[in-house]
Every structure is written in C-alpha cells, then in structure tokens.
From Swiss-Prot:
Family annotation (InterPro entries): Methyltransf_25 (IPR041698), SAM-dependent_MTases_sf (IPR029063)
Similarity-based family: Belongs to the methyltransferase superfamily.
Pfam families in UniProt: Methyltransf_25
Gene Ontology BP, a term: methylation
Function (record text): May be a S-adenosyl-L-methionine (SAM)-dependent methyltransferase.
Descriptive protein name: Putative methyltransferase YqeM
SUPFAM superfamilies the record matches: S-adenosyl-L-methionine-dependent methyltransferases (SSF53335)
Entry EC number(s): 2.1.1.-
Keyword field: Methyltransferase, S-adenosyl-L-methionine, Transferase
Keyword Transferase: yes
Disulphide bond pairs: none
Record GO terms (molecular function): methyltransferase activity
Top EC group: transferase
Amino acid sequence: MIYQGFASVYDELMSHAPYDQWTKWIEASLPEKGRILDLACGTGEISIRLAEKGFEVTGIDLSEEMLSFAQQKVSSSQPILFLQQDMREITGFDGQFDAVVICCDSLNYLKTKNDVIETFKSVFRVLKPEGILLFDVHSSFKIAEVFPDSTFADQDEDISYIWQSFAGSDELSVIHDMSFFVWNGEAYDRFDETHEQRTFPVEEYEEMLKNCGFQLHRVTADFTDTEPSAQSERLFFKAQKSKTIVS
C-alpha cells in the first residue's frame, strides 16, 4: 500500500513543505469558515492548521498508518475527526460540507480519468449546495519535463534517502522509486517504496469537473494569484458545486 513505510518518515521529509501557504490559499478561497473536509489528509498537517483557523475539520485518508500519526498530533482543544476511507467512495457525509480540499498533489495518485471522475462525484455528494472544491495538481510540464530522469537525495544522522523519478507508461505519468535509510539506534534500516503519479491537461480537468456537476471558477499557479504559464509546476483549482444532480 502507498505510504505503508513512508508514514514513519513522512513528517521529517516534509518538514519544509509549504503547509502554511496551502492553508492561506484555502482561507483566501472560501467566503467563510465552515465545515471542511480534508481529503487525502495524510498526517494531518493541513487539517490541524485549518482547525486552528476556526474551521470545523474532518480528515480522510486511505492510509491507516498516516492517520495514526495525524491522530497523535491532535489535542483535546482540536476536535478533528480522522477517518480511513477511499476518496472515490466517501460515505456517511452526504450534503454536509461547505468545502472539500485535496492538497499536496494527492489527486495525482489517481491513475485513471475514471478514478478522478469518481472522486469528483464523491465530492459532489458530500458538499452542500454551492459548496466549494479546492485541489492542486502537478502540471503537465512538471510531470513530462521536470520529474523524468531526476534524482533527489538527502542525508542526515537519522534519515537519508535517494529518490529517482522516471516517465511512466501512461501519458503524463511518472514513477518515483525511493529508498530510505532510517537510524534505529544501532544501525540503519532500509525500506523501498514506489509511487506513481499522473496528471491531465487543465482542459481535461475542467471537462471532468463540468461532467460531475461543478463549475470551474479559477485556475492559478505555484501559490500565486496568476494564471498558469507553460512552465508552471503546480496548478490550483477552485470549483463550485452547481445545482445539477449527479447520480
């Protein structure tokens, strides 16, 4: 399962991730603080920040291991509900959320258009009328031009890793092969993981959103308020649930 070993080192490896920028983008994109669903919430970093800002937060993730770490961070003053579910099949929350967010390119872990469509339909069901969907994805440029044949590495006393990326077999997909070396007090334990991500052109995301009952309001790039360019690497989408009923 994705993140089975990754969960134990995820927070340390992501210690410099721009979580505050994601939170700022979410706040700026929503008209008021209401009930929000953080899909693919991971270890809860964004969920916790949103709760601190005054949102009523529910976090959902596929990984039980990630959710275990998320739950350990929550204090009694932050009543965040964390649940293990598949974002393509959210159950128990029909019409309950003012907004749904899918951050940190989590949507790129869905390998097919049908997976994305099922996720959008699932989100549509749990949103209140005219609720907001916010998500970010890697751009086509980043998947096709930046990641392939790239190697990332880092080393310190506790954790070291080698991260190699290469083009996947599907269009606009990439494979990440990762090897981690974690100090256990006496020696280094090694574990390996392979993750696959895929993206789609903006026009295809817009079409999928429309077919699932959403109106696309805006697409921006790289934590700015500007429209994407040919070299933008991360795209941010804001869509709103229309009055159309999707079965």
